[in-house]
């Protein structure tokens, strides 16, 4: 059978409706974040300012993190040589898991190769092994959570986004004796809004449900030690399992879950996604360990990052640009049309040396295309002013209707 025509049509259709993804070839420069080298289609390298990185605190460039990674490579080499069960558990893994458990005030933690895998593994395993399990999932949960729930085979109930009343109604419709999990996020990555964690925990506790909180876009950034929104609001002890990433505010790579030792042991012992994969490299674990320890002890980066997020939002609002008024560090600038969003992004890069990736369907709904700006502690006022001026200039040239939209 000839498959090429089918595959070509899929690609052509994606190009036609603006879903086709092109990757900007960027080379990060140690010590110069958020500046990077962009290797353009003409083969030339050009210095650009990055405005959409998930390295929220610049920990990927932090001297302590880099030194820890170099030491680990010199000591242990590159890879682990096995799964966690077969020769692949390194001292760095054990120390990192203990540090993450402490970060969230939990008994235990378990690291994975990515945050996507940690959600897939934890939700997929718990939903599968709990008899007659029902999982209640926020309508805007991340793809990794959706896939984990789907993989579990558990019955899924979708509650309206950040709506404890609807969650309560759905939980009330289920047999009280059934095992139940409520899965939600703290900071939602595309809209930048924050979950009402206390209210959701109130509802879950009334119905005897476990709570599973994805803090991927909050760990490192909120709370006295960077434990996330649950840390900031003093709610970590009310959440059964807290999931996070090592690849955003901590600047390295990997994901994790933290919670009661018994639940972590069950996931460790029964998750295919944990059992049958090579463990993360020792130098990645060492770098993440250094990053977590640094963030716990040094609040300055997250304070400056929060200040810069407010500063940029004010500049965007004053310029009349359609930025959502979010309570978090994520600043969505709404465009509303896929091809226009991509054209603006390309013009910003080519004309103004500013890199902002367009966010189109299926990451967001059609008609909700946007840019997702993520200020860091290292963006300056000059960077911000240049971004606003470039957005206005490119917007005028391309006919972008920039009047502010209600959030």
UniProtKB/Swiss-Prot annotation:
This is 5-aminolevulinate synthase 2. Pyridoxal 5'-phosphate binds at residues 189, 217, 245, 277-278. Its cofactor is pyridoxal 5'-phosphate. One of its GO terms (biological process) is protoporphyrinogen IX biosynthetic process. The active site is at 248. Homodimer. InterPro entries: 4pyrrol_synth_NH2levulA_synth, Aminotrans_II_pyridoxalP_BS, Aminotransferase_I/II_large, AON_synthase_class-II, PyrdxlP-dep_Trfase, PyrdxlP-dep_Trfase_major, PyrdxlP-dep_Trfase_small. Pathway: Porphyrin-containing compound metabolism; protoporphyrin-IX biosynthesis; 5-aminolevulinate from glycine: step 1/1. It comes from the Bacteria. It comes from Cereibacter sphaeroides (strain ATCC 17023 / DSM 158 / JCM 6121 / CCUG 31486 / LMG 2827 / NBRC 12203 / NCIMB 8253 / ATH 2.4.1.). One of its GO terms (molecular function) is pyridoxal phosphate binding. It holds the Pfam family Aminotran_1_2. Belongs to the class-II pyridoxal-phosphate-dependent aminotransferase family.
């Amino acid at each position: 059978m000839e498959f090429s025509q089918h595959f070509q049509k899929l690609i052509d259709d994606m190009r036609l409706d603006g879903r086709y993804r092109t990757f900007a070839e960027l080379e990060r420069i140690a010590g110069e974040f958020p500046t990077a080298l962009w290797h353009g289609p003409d083969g030339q390298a050009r210095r650009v300012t990055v405005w959409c990185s998930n390295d929220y605190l610049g920990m990927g460039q932090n001297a302590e993190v880099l030194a820890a990674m170099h030491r680990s490579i010199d000591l242990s080499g590159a890879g682990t040589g096995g799964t966690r069960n077969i020769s692949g558990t390194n001292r760095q893994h054990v120390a990192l898991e203990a540090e993450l458990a402490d970060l969230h005030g939990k008994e235990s933690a378990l690291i994975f190769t990515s945050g996507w895998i940690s959600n897939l593994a934890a939700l997929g395993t718990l939903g599968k092994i709990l008899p007659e399990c029902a999982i209640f999932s926020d309508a805007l949960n991340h793809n990794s959570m959706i896939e984990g729930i789907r993989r579990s085979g558990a019955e899924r109930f979708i509650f309206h986004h950040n709506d404890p009343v609807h969650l309560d109604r759905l939980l009330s419709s289920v047999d009280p004796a059934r095992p139940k999990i409520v899965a939600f996020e703290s900071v939602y990555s595309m809209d930048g809004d924050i979950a009402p964690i206390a209210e959701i925990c109130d509802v879950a506790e009334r119905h005897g449900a476990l709570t599973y909180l994805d803090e991927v876009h909050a760990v490192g950034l909120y709370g006295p030690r960077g434990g996330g929104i649950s840390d900031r609001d003093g709610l970590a002890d009310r959440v059964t399992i807290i999931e996070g990433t090592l690849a955003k505010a901590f600047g390295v790579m990997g994901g994790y879950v933290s919670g009661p030792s018994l639940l972590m042991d069950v996931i460790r012992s029964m998750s295919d996604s944990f059992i049958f994969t090579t463990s993360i490299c020792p130098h990645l674990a060492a770098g993440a360990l250094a990053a977590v320890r640094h963030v716990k002890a040094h609040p300055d980066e997250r304070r400056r990052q929060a200040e810069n997020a407010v500063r940029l939002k004010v500049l965007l609002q004053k310029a009349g640009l359609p930025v959502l008024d979010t309570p978090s560090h994520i600043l969505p600038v709404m465009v509303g049309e896929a091809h226009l969003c991509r054209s603006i992004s390309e013009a910003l890069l080519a004309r103004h040396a500013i890199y902002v990736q367009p966010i189109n369907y299926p990451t967001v709904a059609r008609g909700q295309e946007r840019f997702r700006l993520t200020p860091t502690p290292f963006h300056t006022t000059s960077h911000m002013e240049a971004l606003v001026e470039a957005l206005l200039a490119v917007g005028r040239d391309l006919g972008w209707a920039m009047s502010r939209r209600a959030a």
